[in-house]
Amino acid sequence: DLWQWGQMILKETGKIPFSYYGAYGCYCGWGGRGGKPKAGTDRCCYVHDCCYGKLTSCPKTDDRYSYSRLDLTIVCGEDDPCKELCECDKKIAVCFRENLGTYNKKYRYHLKSCKKADKPC
């Protein structure tokens, strides 16, 4: 669910996810806006959108799943029916951490060059 997703991102990046990533680039934020992702951070959101689109179980973003942290690693519950959803959220949290250096404030609330046509997954 959104709270769990937010907690993963906060623990990985130290950033408050909804204010930091909520309206960033072409893909970060509810639903994405399409076009070419803006650098690494926005690419994380693009990949996350694609991951959600490929879910075969628990396709809803409000479904809860089990996960823990082992040392500094996110571990999704092995037998959880929503493990795929957890793995998508884990990937974006780790991607955001790995791409903290690509975050550019000029892409906050950036809609100008976002096209309607999505880049195919």
Swiss-Prot record:
Enzyme's top EC category: hydrolase
Tissues in which the protein is found: Expressed by the venom gland.
Signal sequence, renumbered to the chain: none
Gene Ontology cellular component list: extracellular region
Binding site for Ca(2+): Y27, G29, G31, D49
Reactions it catalyzes: a 1,2-diacyl-sn-glycero-3-phosphocholine + H2O = a 1-acyl-sn-glycero-3-phosphocholine + a fatty acid + H(+)
Record's keyword terms, sorted: Calcium, Cytolysis, Disulfide bond, Hydrolase, Lipid degradation, Lipid metabolism, Metal-binding, Myotoxin, Neurotoxin, Presynaptic neurotoxin, Secreted, Toxin
EC code: 3.1.1.4
Disulfide bonds: C26-C114, C28-C45, C44-C95, C50-C121, C51-C88, C58-C82, C76-C86
Keyword Secreted recorded: yes
Cross-referenced CDD domains: PLA2c (cd00125)
SMART domains: PA2c
InterPro entries: PLipase_A2, PLipase_A2_Asp_AS, PLipase_A2_dom, PLipase_A2_dom_sf, PLipase_A2_His_AS
Predominant localisation class: secreted
GO molecular function terms attached to this record: calcium ion binding; calcium-dependent phospholipase A2 activity; phospholipase A2 activity; phospholipid binding; toxin activity
Cofactor(s) of this protein: Ca(2+)
Catalytic center residues: H48, D89
Subcellular location: Secreted
Cofactor remark: Binds 1 Ca(2+) ion.
GO biological process, one term: arachidonate secretion
Family statement: Belongs to the phospholipase A2 family. Group II subfamily. D49 sub-subfamily.
UniProt-listed PANTHER family: PHOSPHOLIPASE A2 FAMILY MEMBER, PHOSPHOLIPASE A2, MEMBRANE ASSOCIATED
Free-text function comment from the UniProt entry: Snake venom phospholipase A2 (PLA2) that induces blockade of neuromuscular contraction in an indirectly stimulated chick biventer cervicis nerve-muscle preparation. Does not inhibit contraction of chick biventer cervicic nerve-muscle preparation in response to treatment with acetylcholine or KCl. The neuromuscular blockade is mediated by inhibitory action at the presynaptic motor nerve endings. Lyses skeletal myoblasts and myotubes in vitro, and intramuscular injection causes local muscle necrosis. Induces edema in the mouse foot pad. Induces a transient increase of IL-6 levels.
The name this protein goes by in its record: Basic phospholipase A2 BmjeTX-II
Organism name: Bothrops marajoensis (Marajo lancehead)
